[in-house]
Amino acid sequence: MIVLHARDCDPKACTALRAHRMGLVELTRHPGDVPTGAVVLDPTVEKALSREDRDAALERGLVAVDCSWEHVHRYFGPLRRRCRHRILPYLIAANPVNYGKPCKLSTVEALAAALYILGFRREAEEFISRFKWGPAFLELNRERLEAYRRAETSAEVVRVQEEFLPDGL
Ligand SMILES: C[S@@+](CC[C@H](N)C(=O)[O-])C[C@H]1O[C@@H](n2cnc3c(N)ncnc32)[C@H](O)[C@@H]1O
């Protein structure tokens, strides 16, 4: 797994830097280092991640972009022409900064959720359990993650998501 790091976060609270220090992810500051065809977790697009992206993630890589939420629209543009950009379906954050907020996941929550949905459940659990609040993220979202994992296509993930959306979203 690769994190493109924008250096605009608080380094003490940055989950990507912590994951890198633990040897769990590769870190780069250069968009050119992201492999062509990689699956990029991008909260600004419409197409949802699903098992259909599993081969691309395995062969080309799974990528998150660690930047501040205020600047999230700036960083994905340069990759969009050559990578598969995917949004995660409805999930709730359990990290201390955004606890309880829908869809605003930390970088490591996003990567763990992606692993889970792509069918790498054990790897997702091992990865997120390295963080104090990781197991809480899984418990809070277990039913949703299981349902998304079972969906075969992006369209099906979106259909399944409808069941979990609170009224008005
Ligand atoms: C905006 S950064 C914030 C990072 C935060 N400062 C941290 O320390 O974890 C979170 C990144 O995780 C991924 N991500 C988070 N929520 C997502 C979602 N709902 N859909 C797709 N990707 C998401 C994206 O790559 C996003 O840029």
Curated annotation (Swiss-Prot):
E.C. number(s) listed in UniProt: 2.5.1.157
PANTHER family, per the entry: 18S RRNA AMINOCARBOXYPROPYLTRANSFERASE, RIBOSOME BIOGENESIS PROTEIN TSR3 HOMOLOG
Protein's recorded name: 16S rRNA aminocarboxypropyltransferase
Gene Ontology cellular component list: cytoplasm
Keyword Cytoplasm: yes
Record's function text: Aminocarboxypropyltransferase that catalyzes the aminocarboxypropyl transfer on pseudouridine corresponding to position 914 in M.jannaschii 16S rRNA. It constitutes the last step in biosynthesis of the hypermodified N1-methyl-N3-(3-amino-3-carboxypropyl) pseudouridine (m1acp3-Psi).
Location(s) in or outside the cell: Cytoplasm
Pfam families named in the record: Ribo_biogen_C (PF04034)
GO molecular function: 18S rRNA aminocarboxypropyltransferase activity; S-adenosyl-L-methionine binding
Stated family: Belongs to the TDD superfamily. TSR3 family.
Keyword Transferase in record: yes
